[in-house]
């Protein structure tokens, strides 16, 4: 948090409720400093979406943590998702998808650099889906062995050109803060700070920096006020559940700046 605060940024932290020590004091401290705390699955075992019955049971437990933590945001471990089942969660938004990422265990991508809305079959319940639009730090630095921020910079510039949303997922446990030899998956935190500095310096005064909950609130207002929207078209790049929801007209894609944000 110190690193981001020094550069004028804030972010959201998502914690796995079971199997990890997540104290109320830690969550309160995060929120008190202007950051956000959300729920990251139930356990980090890759089994959350194995069966609909199993998810239904686990969703009850997840909702308990959402209420206890006073959180309205959810993130699935390993970016696994079923956007229809997630409607069982009492959330305002979810961040379990990505615009494009061939290195994730679940196939299919969303193919857009904008948030969108998922509606229940009755049309009353909905949540905002906020896909990440920049490669994860683990993919770039730990898996692919990149040593510069060139990929981030190139993608960010493309997003800006198309008036889209820059959403980056990082893992602080991979940050190497002292440049000493750590575990093999660590990378210098300077790569992250250099990217934040690039954003701040090149695009000063040109971006709206908010927490995910604020982004979700913005798009929720658009949903309830029947703001201008564009329906997504089913595509082979999407997972089967996403294609089904689109065909049922339960997915609404927003383009608030009137630009073409499809990849």
Question: PLM features: residue spans?
Answer:
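The substrate-binding groove and active-site-proximal loops of carbohydrate-active enzymes
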Residues: 10-17, 42-53, 69-73, 138-147, ...
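Acidic (Asp/Glu)-rich catalytic clusters
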Residues: 1-8, 20-40, 119-125, 155-164
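Active-site beta->alpha N-cap acidic-glycine motif
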Residues: 1-33, 82, 144-145, 150, ...
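Generic structural signal for well-ordered alpha-helices
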Residues: 1, 24-28, 55-63, 156, ...
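Active-site-adjacent pocket scaffolds in enzyme catalytic domains
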Residues: 64-164, 252, 257
